[in-house]
Regions:
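Extracytoplasmic gate region of multi-pass secondary transporters
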Residues: 42-49, 228-297, 381
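Intracellular juxtamembrane helix-capping segments at the cytosolic ends
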Residues: 49, 130-143, 151, 345-358
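Interfacial helix-cap and linker-helix signal at transmembrane-aqueous boundaries
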Residues: 49-50, 82-83, 164, 168-176, ...
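Central cavity-lining transmembrane alpha-helices of secondary-active solute carriers
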Residues: 66-81, 282-294
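C-terminal ends and interior cores of transmembrane alpha-helices
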Residues: 97-111, 314-327
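Hydrophobic core of transmembrane alpha-helices in multi-pass small-molecule transporters
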Residues: 102, 114-129, 244, 331-345
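Helix-loop-helix hairpin linking two adjacent transmembrane segments in secondary transporters
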Residues: 158-205
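C-terminal transmembrane helical hairpin of 12-TM major facilitator-type secondary transporters
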Residues: 252, 275-353
Length: 430
């Protein structure tokens, strides 16, 4: 049960603007929009990178994307620990500096693919990861009553923010080359990220929203699990396996969209005078954002596991359908955004469920550990998928078949394994 005094504690501590949880949520969404391009715009840089580094196999260029995801995810348990312990502002400033350096140095100083491994992969990846975990965990802390919606809105900034910028970035690449575009966008994104860092705060100790009523369809623990305690629970490993598998198909599509379009013989098509890949990627970004908000809100009402099972099954079907549309650019433009609609929800559902199952106090560190599954998925989705496609004359059909199976298995795990595990354990806490 909450009180008005509890609700006013945030205003008393931070003032009426910074202490408003909706302002906190909005600042987190803006920060996510800033870092979204580092993941979703990579496919726009690949044609220029292939031209600049013509003697380098595409799988080695795709490794830039894989390394970005790895460094975006694997350092997060440590970053999450420091965020929970020392607060969000300093870590956000560090992340902002790293993304600024990543693209700025990549555009001005990179002369080899290895240089981009360091700049785009390590620097930008680590910075984006710090900002990502900071904002998602902050949303979970500020919205215990609407975790699915808050996590979905925050993650929507990451999934859909690129919809605002992919076409402008594509135009920048066309006019400035990939180096100039990477430099100018790196500077702008770094400045905006710093501005959000100056706003973001964790809620004061003891704060709860006014008149909070726990959602009936969502089971939430009353305990606060440390990372070590969380990793002693079977449900954590089930969630990790599910996150890993469902991530694979979406990441593969995100990082290789240009090559997938070429393998489907639709790359040279245009729509309304716009090249098909940036146009489709923009629409897909919108659907990706919609997915995180809509599925997150649905999960608040109907439960996380039921929502996961439905969405993952839909994703598996859509991923399989992608293998059947060779030579059909209209089908590509229609189907691809729906792939993202059925995939983007994982970042809302798993972050919200981490707070439900293991408590909000250590949400940054706990979700940071779970989020490393995305790093493992990136190995299969980036370099791995490109290598397998090369074995089949550039076709991504086999990687997509594997991803579809992963999605269906994850849907089954959500209903038949994760749901009973969580309910049994939390019922035993009473």
């Amino acid at each position: 049960m909450t009180t008005t005094a509890s609700n006013d504690l945030a205003t008393e501590t931070y003032g009426p603007i910074v202490g408003n949880r909706w302002i906190q949520l909005a600042a987190g969404v803006v920060a996510m929009i800033v870092i979204s391009n580092f993941q979703y715009a990579f496919t726009l840089f690949t044609p220029g990178l292939k031209e600049t580094f013509a003697d380098v196999p595409y799988a080695d260029i795709a490794l830039i994307y894989t390394l970005f995801i790895l460094f975006e995810t694997w350092p997060l348990p440590v970053a999450g620990y420091f965020i929970d312990k020392f607060g969000i502002r300093n870590l956000m400033l560090l992340g902002s500096a790293l993304i600024f350096l990543g693209w700025t140095l990549g555009g001005t100083m990179a002369t080899t693919v290895f240089d981009l491994y360091i700049c785009y992969g390590f620097l930008a990846g680590t910075g984006a990861g710090i900002i990502y975990i900071s904002t998602v965990a902050n949303a979970v802390k500020w919205f215990p009553d609407k975790r699915g919606l808050a996590a979905g809105l925050t993650a929507a900034g990451f999934g859909g923010g690129s919809a605002l910028t992919l076409i402008p970035i594509s135009a920048s690449i066309a006019s400035q080359g990939w180096q100039g575009a990477m430099t100018s966008w790196g500077i702008g994104q770094g400045v905006v990220a710093v501005a959000t860092a100056l706003v973001l705060r964790h809620p004061p100790k003891g704060w709860l929203p006014k008149d909070w009523v726990q959602p009936k369809a969502v089971v939430q623990t009353r305990l606060e699990f440390t990372p070590k305690q969380m990793m002693g629970k079977t449900e954590f490993y089930v969630m990790y396996a599910m996150f890993l598998m469902v991530c694979t198909g979406g990441l593969m599509t995100t990082g290789n969209m240009s090559q997938i379009a070429k393998s489907l013989n639709v790359y040279d098509a245009t729509f309304m005078g716009i090249a098909i890949v940036p146009f489709t990627a923009t629409v897909a970004g919108v659907m990706n954002a919609v997915a995180r908000v809509v599925w997150g809100a649905i999960s608040d009402r109907f439960g996380r596991e039921y929502t996961m099972a439905f969405a993952f099954t839909l994703e598996g079907v859509l991923i399989f359908m992608m293998t059947q549309i060779s030579g059909n650019p209209i089908a590509f433009m229609i189907l691809m955004p729906f792939v993202f609609l059925a995939w983007g929800e994982i970042y809302a559902l798993f972050s919200a469920m981490t707070g439900d199952v293991f408590g909000p106090k250590n949400a940054s560190a706990n979700y940071g550990i779970l989020y490393t599954a995305k790093g493992l998925a990136s190995i299969m989705a980036g370099w791995g998928a490109a290598a397998v496609a090369a074995m089949y004359a550039g076709s991504f059909s086999v990687p997509y078949y594997i991803a579809a199976v992963f999605d269906i298995v994850s849907a089954v795990l959500a209903l038949l394994v994760l749901r009973p595990l969580v309910r049994k354990r939390i019922a035993g806490e009473a």
